[in-house]
Every structure is written in C-alpha cells, then in structure tokens.
Amino acid sequence: NMKIPFSPPYIDANVINEVVDSLKSGWITTGPKVKALEEEIGKISGVKNVLCINSWTSGAILMLRWLGLQPGDEVIVPAYTYSATAMAVLWAGGKPVMVDSTEDFNISVEGIKNAITEKTKAIIPVDIAGFPCDYDAIMELVKSEKIKALFHATSEIQEKLGRILVLSDSAHSIGAHYG
C-alpha cells in the first residue's frame, strides 16, 4: 500500500518563521507583508494593480460577479476537480455545468463544445497535476464565429469581452508551463 503525495506543501523553517512573524505583528490579512507581496507580484508580472485575497475560490467568485453573472447563467466546469470550482459558480449566483475529462484528467474540449448554450457566460478549466488544459483549443472554440453567435452579453463587461470568459484554475499546477 504505497502513498504517493499529490500536492504536498513546502514548509521549511523560513516559512514557519514568516507565519509566526505575521501572527505576532497583528496583521494577518491586509498588512505590510500582503502589500509587499502585491508589489512583488506586480513587478514580476508587469501588472500595475495587484490584489491578493485569501483563496482562488474567493477570486473566482469576485471574477464571476465582476463579469455580471446572473441567476440562470451557466458556467462550464470540469467534473473532475475539487468542489470549490463548482461552488464558486453557485456562490456567484450561476449554474455550474459539468463536463467530463479526457485521459489526462483535464476537461474535454469536445465536451465543452457540446455543453455551450446561449446561457453560457464562462468556462473554468482546471489544470490537474501539472498538466495544463488545451487552452489553444479552448480559446479557438470561444472565439469561433459559431460560438460567439450563441453568446448574449448581459453586462457591460460581457459586452466589452464579446465572448465567453475563460477563467483558468491552476491550483495543482503551479510552475507548469503551457505551450
């Protein structure tokens, strides 16, 4: 009976010391360490405004609400993933539509194609175990004239985007490269 760790956290003495330092400082959410992290991420990524939050789930809820998700709007998610992906859709007021995976455990592009309706506002592919989803094929699909013709914007943000939003979740693929 062999145990193979799927996603073990890296916690050394330095990580522990930083956590203890943060706890002792009295700032555990929006303090100076978070601000420094936001600035560092901004420098590395070349992004002007960075906002760190507590989890990907909270970020997904914010993104879906920013998108203008309404009750009855559909968001395509993989059937093989952590429940937080579908829960974020529910918490944002939408309806998750689950699509099966392929042999690499990532969401099926053909399944996405078959699941898209006039109510589809977003797709949340989830990269599994360091293997990114086929974003080229997903983006080609959502940018195709046939799929864009199905898309009906119901918010200013959706109007500007002009297509279904693709919101990537790479929770178990940090450090993986696509392309």
Which stretches of residues belong to each language-model region?
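Short, polar loop motifs at secondary-structure junctions
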Residues: 171-175
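N-terminal "arm"/small-domain region of PLP-dependent enzymes with the aminotransferase-like
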Residues: 1-28, 32
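Phosphate-binding glycine-rich loop
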Residues: 27-74, 88-91, 98, 146, ...
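PLP-dependent aminotransferase-like
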Residues: 65-170
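Short, intrinsically disordered, charge-balanced linker/junction segments flanking boundaries
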Residues: 1, 176-179
